[in-house]
Amino acid sequence: MRARYLALAVTLAAALLPFRPSAAAEPFDAEQKKAIEILLHDYLLAHPEILEEAIRALQAKRTAEAAAQREKKLAALHKEVEDDPATPVAGDLNGDVTLIQFFDYQCGYCKSVLPALQQLMQEDRRIRFVMKEVPLLGPASVHAARAGLAAWKIAPEKYLGFHMALMGLKTAITDDSVMELARRNGLDPKRLRDAMADPTIDAAIQRNHALAESLEITGTPAFIVGKTFVPGAVDLAALRKLIAEARGR
């Protein structure tokens, strides 16, 4: 690629010699500009792959810039991301790596990641898991998010089982299905329902939405592992790799 640009530069220089008798930095006149435009046009037609390479380089540059910007935001929002008391936490509370998931209980991709997360929890006891409720898919998602956060509020030791059951639900999320899962996981439906109405629950959901917006998270699932942001569903192998990379930093 450099050779091509060098060839283009040499060709341009040679073409401009008749028009540039002095080394003074003077603006191109109309005739010179036209000559350059024709030269570039003809060269790019003969070597269109240069445009593809330039587009790829631009995309890579923008991706790297976005990643760097998000990392700065993560550093600035560290406390809000990792240490909100209303946010459920599982695994080793003093773990050497923190894995944060933004999720919606109705999200099919979130459900598809559940087995990988369950396996990771079983095989690696040094991870701190942070669960960020971001209901995006309508009233049922909001209802489920309230239930999850309320379970954490009234019985944190029973949250994880309830969360897994709710995420693994194959049928539609309704108030009846949510309360039935609560009963099965040792939660008092009345206490849960009362806690769901607590204004602090909706406030926590609003904070999560604001946080997701700040981090430019527009869909679920999304993960933050250490300092790495990962949008979309990931498999167990990818999660293991991300954890290993976070530990290696």
Where are these regions (language model features)?
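C-terminal cap of thioredoxin/glutaredoxin-like
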Residues: 5-6, 25-41, 61, 180-249
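Solvent-exposed, acidic/flexible segments
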Residues: 29-33, 37, 44, 48-51, ...
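Ser/Thr-centric signal marking residues that sit
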Residues: 11, 98, 220
